[in-house]
Amino acid sequence: PVIVKPDIGVGAANTWKLENDGDLEAFYDALPEIPYVMEEFVQGDLCSYEAILNASCEPLFENMTVWPTPIMNIVNDDLDLMYYTCPDVPKKLRDLGRKTSRAFGVDRRFVHLEFFRLTGDRKGLGKKGDYVGLEVNMRPPGGYTPDMMNFAHSTDVYQIYADMAVFDESRVPVSEDKYYCVYAGRKEGHLYRHTHEEILDRWGGDIVMSEEMPPVNWPQMGRFMYTARLKTLAEVRSFIRFVQTPPERGRQE
């Protein structure tokens, strides 16, 4: 299989997986007028490296975000979005993120670099657990992800960026109080085991954001969202299940 996507795109819009000759011919029969990129399909966990870089391309702030289900599948298969920011950045990803930023000569920017973490050995790409580059974005990640970084790291990335622009350094104290911050969306028309009231009753002490999203974000992020700050990955998974499990497959958490 291969993936085709616009050379300049946002949120996996007009991105498809082509699995056979018929898919390929159908794509070329209705070839879009804008430039497209075709790339090898890679099986792995989607992880991203975010950083605020100073004038010397050195990071003033770093973050890792994990996207269990790629946005392309969320949009094309009408799935619910869930993802989370992490309290720490693994050394392997941190080193790759820094090297990639330097290779592109990026300075005085907020960057969002995407990688696949291979779930199995892949000839020509790497071993299980290795990171494979997907795309580079010389901008922050979308949605409320910058706010999720703030909750995860007990910091203020907006102030760090402002400090970088004015002083070429961060003047925000580094906190040791770190968490996972998880986003779980709900789409219009989907059925769920737990009501809004039940979610707030169970997780209200951990929820830091809960609101209806702008309509433009509904295909990717869902109409309603819940964002929680949690200490363990097990809690993250339990929160996602509680928010998104449909009635027919649900069980009381």
Can you describe what each PLM-predicted range is?
Residues P1-G44, N54-C57, L81-D95, F239-P247:
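Active-site nucleotide/adenylate-binding loops and adjacent lid/helix of ATP-dependent enzymes
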Residues G11-A12, G44-L46, K178, Q220:
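Short acidic/glycine-enriched loop/turn segments that link adjacent beta-strands
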Residues A162-E253:
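Peripheral (often C-terminal) accessory segments that flank ATP-dependent C-N-forming ligase machineries
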